[in-house]
């Protein structure tokens, strides 16, 4: 595959993730959309790194994965605590964090 193919795939994955975040109201599904966008950016970083023949893209993608893992831990903990309090993870019904 060429660089253009990887970038088109990355753009497609990012678009699907962004559409998921914008359209869905379930916090878990929105969370998966954000993770899809992060993985799409990782694919672009690695593709550009391979184009230039350096490990910079892989290193950046690794750090993005580390930050994404921390995001998953914190995000799922927040979603679970909201579910325990409200018995729903719908974003429309949440006013728990207001005020």
Swiss-Prot record:
The chain crosses the membrane at residues 3-23, 28-48, 59-79. Pfam families: Oxidored_q2 (PF00420). Disulfide bonds: none annotated. It is an enzyme of class 7 (translocase). It is found in: Cell membrane. GO terms for molecular function: NADH:ubiquinone reductase (non-electrogenic) activity; quinone binding. It is a multi-pass membrane protein. GO terms for cellular component: NADH dehydrogenase complex; plasma membrane. GO terms for biological process: ATP synthesis coupled electron transport. InterPro entries: NADH_UbQ_OxRdtase_chain4L/K, NUOK/Mnh_C1-like. It catalyses: a quinone + NADH + 5 H(+)(in) = a quinol + NAD(+) + 4 H(+)(out). Its main location: membrane. Its EC number is 7.1.1.-. Keywords: Cell membrane, Membrane, NAD, Quinone, Translocase, Transmembrane, Transmembrane helix, Transport. NDH-1 is composed of 14 different subunits. Subunits NuoA, H, J, K, L, M, N constitute the membrane sector of the complex. PANTHER family: NADH DEHYDROGENASE SUBUNIT 4L-RELATED, NADH-UBIQUINONE OXIDOREDUCTASE SUBUNIT ND4L. NDH-1 shuttles electrons from NADH, via FMN and iron-sulfur (Fe-S) centers, to quinones in the respiratory chain. The immediate electron acceptor for the enzyme in this species is believed to be a menaquinone. Couples the redox reaction to proton translocation (for every two electrons transferred, four hydrogen ions are translocated across the cytoplasmic membrane), and thus conserves the redox energy in a proton gradient. Belongs to the complex I subunit 4L family. This is NADH-quinone oxidoreductase subunit K. It comes from Beutenbergia cavernae (strain ATCC BAA-8 / DSM 12333 / CCUG 43141 / JCM 11478 / NBRC 16432 / NCIMB 13614 / HKI 0122). The gene is nuoK.
């Amino acid at each position: 595959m060429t660089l253009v193919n990887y970038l088109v795939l990355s753009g497609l994955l990012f678009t699907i993730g962004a559409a998921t975040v914008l359209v869905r109201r379930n916090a878990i599904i929105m969370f998966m959309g954000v993770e899809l966008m992060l993985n799409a950016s990782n694919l672009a970083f690695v593709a550009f790194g391979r184009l230039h023949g350096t490990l910079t893209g892989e290193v950046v993608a690794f750090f993005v994965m580390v930050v994404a893992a921390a995001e998953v831990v914190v995000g799922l903990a927040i979603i679970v605590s909201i579910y325990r309090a409200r018995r729903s993870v719908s974003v429309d019904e949440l006013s728990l964090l207001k005020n």
